[in-house]
Swiss-Prot record:
It comes from Bordetella parapertussis (strain 12822 / ATCC BAA-587 / NCTC 13253). The keyword Glycoprotein does not apply. This is Ribosome maturation factor RimM. Belongs to the RimM family. The PRC barrel domain binds ribosomal protein uS19. Keywords: Chaperone, Cytoplasm, Ribosome biogenesis, rRNA processing. Residues 114-207 form the PRC barrel domain. Coiled coil: none annotated. GO terms for biological process: ribosomal small subunit biogenesis; rRNA processing.
Amino acid sequence: MSEAAHSGAAPADLVELGRIASAYGVKGWVKVQPHSAQAEVLRTVSHWWLTRPAPQAARGVVASVPRAYQVLQARVHGGAVVAQLAGIDDRDQAEALRGCLVQAARSAFPAPADDEYYWVDLIGCALYSDADGESRLLGVVDEVFDNGAHAVLKVLRQQLQPGQPGPVPLVDPKGRPLEELVPFVRAHIRHVDLAARRIDSDWPLDY
């Protein structure tokens, strides 16, 4: 990577936000494909931490150590984000970053607006349903994605069972985890308590 990168210790709270897809123009700008629709973080943080992932076919090879680049300018361009990084001054230098994962410190994210949440904060939250009048565990949020209209929670089904110290994962007859896709919209989500790692909804339990 370029000598413009800062090689200090990476923050412990790095969150992967996208991947550098290509160079953009001839003045060293890069184009990033965000992992989610919440690309505003890429535009607002002052530094990106770039990591070159290990080749999937290479055994024993690990990803590179994250290095920080100062973000001089960044803007949305279609479904991507284009940015100018300090020390990256021409297309060749930008192309050398192709494929790098783009991360940022969670502590550097701007505060979300009321009733808005960063997707990364929803992962790991327990989702409960009161569709039948009683609050019951549906499962734990494993992933959040955009279906083009709104965010969707991918929930790994779990159930509280007598005699068990914690929730028990539910599986199908072949032993595969049961999943539920729950729209993350006001019509179904009643309350989000990030401190308690809990989301309450009226999504029906469908055993």
